[in-house]
Swiss-Prot record:
Gene Ontology terms: cellular component: cytoplasm; plasma membrane
Upper taxonomic lineage: Eukaryota, Metazoa, Chordata, Craniata, Vertebrata
Keyword match Nucleotidyltransferase: no
Organism name: Danio rerio
Biased composition (Basic and acidic residues): 211-221
The protein's name: Protein naked cuticle homolog 1
Binding-site list for Ca(2+): D142, D144, N146, K148, D153
Amino acid sequence: MGKLHSKHAAICKARESPEGDSFVVNACLARKGLDDWMVKQKYYCSSSRVDQRDCQQKNNCELSPRDPLDEGYAEGISDEHYRLEVALPPEKTDSCSVEERMQGTEGSATVGPHKQLQFEELECAVSVEEDNRQEWTFTLYDFDNNGKVTREDITSLLHTIYEVVDASVNHSPSSSKTLRVKLSVAPDSSQRWKNCTQTNTDTPNPKHKGEKCIEDSKTSEKKSRAFLRRYHAEHHSQQGCQRHCVDENLERRNHYLDLAGIENYTSRFGTAAPATEPAKPTHATRSSNQSRSRSQEPENGQVHPAHHRRSQTMSTDPPAILTRHTHALRSPKTHRTPPTQASAGRVMRRGAPPPPSVPNQTPPHQSSGPYRRHKQRPKEALHYRALGPSVTSGPVLEKEHVRDLPSLVLYEGGLAQVVQRHEHHHHHEHHHHYHHFYQS
């Protein structure tokens, strides 16, 4: 039936390597020892029969493609056994000593019973550099000998590994092969020790030149420490930057809130401002200026036609009066005044100005003629019907203050307009009533 259609071909697949023909073996290390594992690998690669017990070992062998016209095809497989690349997955064991892994090998230098070299993981890799040279790399992870590892321990361990490898490799009588055994020991995470040594010795075997060395794990530790140092430095710098940014944002937000005047907005406009309150600096936002100018549109519409008939003079009132005046303009009650209320307010201001101490229960137009009383009654009815019970003495007193002031300064878009309310209303109602007097 042939090798390509047998059970062996099911787990052995052809592979082309750019370096040439090679044989790749992935195997799990048995606890019986390295010798049993090497015997099994040699049996898999030299035989075509694989039973069910061997399939459970999860060994994958890949045969490189060869010329089918080659007469020595079976001999080529035995020759290819020298070209091995073994990648062992790490196997975690519970305190497995080197004696248990290395027992049963002929001529092996056993470690003394008082020496219990323990390691958690073992990794073995074999690479083929040339036709007559192989390199075997063993890595022991979490290697610990109670924190005391001597040169003799490492040397005996390396000799044991080399004898196991030498016994597992087929020797060709016609050619010599160089085996390089490399041992890497990674220290235990709980212990920091650096007693790893490196040895390079040749074996007395005339057919093989053994090169033995030990890799120190200082480079890996330096890399890990540098990585941790860099991580901590970046972490601390990021924390400092974030803290600085948060403080800067809070200061900027408080500064903008102070500029907008939002902190004391409700306490400032909830009740009438006292006369002793200092004047607020004129750094209000432009949107608030526009909203205040829109609230005065019914009065500003009558201000502009008569504004060119009088000179523009700057107000020289005391600070207390200006403060009360600006608060009367900024009051939310004034913002919500409907047009009927504004017109009624103008009607109430048409009469003679009463003294400031007189309350506003008495209508100010009683001293006028009968035609004024007749025309102002429906407007007063509409005014009191629109206001209802919400009319209090607060806005009325504020309007009295506004009427008594000789001039008013409004800021809109950076341009100052001097509006003389009292003089304007005097001219306007004189012209208006003069016209009505002649019509009637």
